[in-house]
Amino acid sequence: MLKIQNLKKSYGKRTILNNVNMNIPKGKVYALIGPNGAGKSTIMKILTGLVSKTSGSIIFEGREWSRRDLRKIGSIIEEPPLYKNLSAYDNMKVVTTMLGVSESTILPLLNKVGLGNIDKRPVKQFSLGMKQRLGIAISLINSPKLLILDEPTNGLDPIGIQELREIIESFKSEGMTIMISSHILSEVEHLADFIGFIYEGKIILEKEYDGSENLEELFNNQILFEKRR
């Protein structure tokens, strides 16, 4: 589905990403894990066209990634850009109209994220968790091949975190390809099929994950190994 080879990103003399290599298989959940400032968001911003790469190769569906592929990628990188005085439905309608997608897709997508039965109240009255779920519904309007979620549970209360986990689990059961980032290992250990540990701008470990290993222990051991190299 997606292969990243020798990806670099620098700002002047400051290197943010240093020869990053990743392989995200189709139909799997790939968890990008690392501390704040490790480079997780930079990778996701490059993949969604928000930031340009310095060098390296990105292969998407068997060919070199280009900006035309952005229509095939749904994403929540920062707080969703919502119209706060409009309802969830009307927010969706704005985007379907802009993209030329049938309005009939709106309610099924709202149901998919647990927002199909809410009233017409404006988004400004929503909790952060509801805004995140609406953002995800909007990101699915174009039927993307890849869904990218950058620390989607950040700032949510326990109820919001659980609701979002259940939604991602339902996407996983449908075979959707998802890339999710987090610095909290417990948030992804039940979701991930593959893990990539990023530390100081480098992928220090990438492997298939079946849930049998303790992620925190695995990550800490890998960091110790890197520091000793």
Swiss-Prot record:
Family per record: Belongs to the ABC transporter superfamily.
Record keyword Kinase present: no
Its biological purpose: Implicated in the export process of the lantibiotic SrtA.
Entry's Gene Ontology BP terms: bacteriocin transport; protein transport
UniProt name for this protein: Lantibiotic transport ATP-binding protein SrtF
Record domain ABC transporter: where: 2-225
InterPro entries found in the cross-reference section: AAA+_ATPase, ABC_Gallidermin_ATP-bd, ABC_transporter-like_ATP-bd, ABC_transporter-like_CS, P-loop_NTPase
A GO MF term: ATP hydrolysis activity
Chain's gene name: srtF
Source organism of this protein record: Streptococcus pyogenes serotype M1
Pfam families hit by this protein: ABC_tran (PF00005)
Positions that bind ATP: G34, P35, N36, G37, A38, G39, K40, S41
Keyword annotations from UniProtKB, A to Z: ATP-binding, Bacteriocin transport, Nucleotide-binding, Protein transport, Transport
Positions of disulphide bridges: none
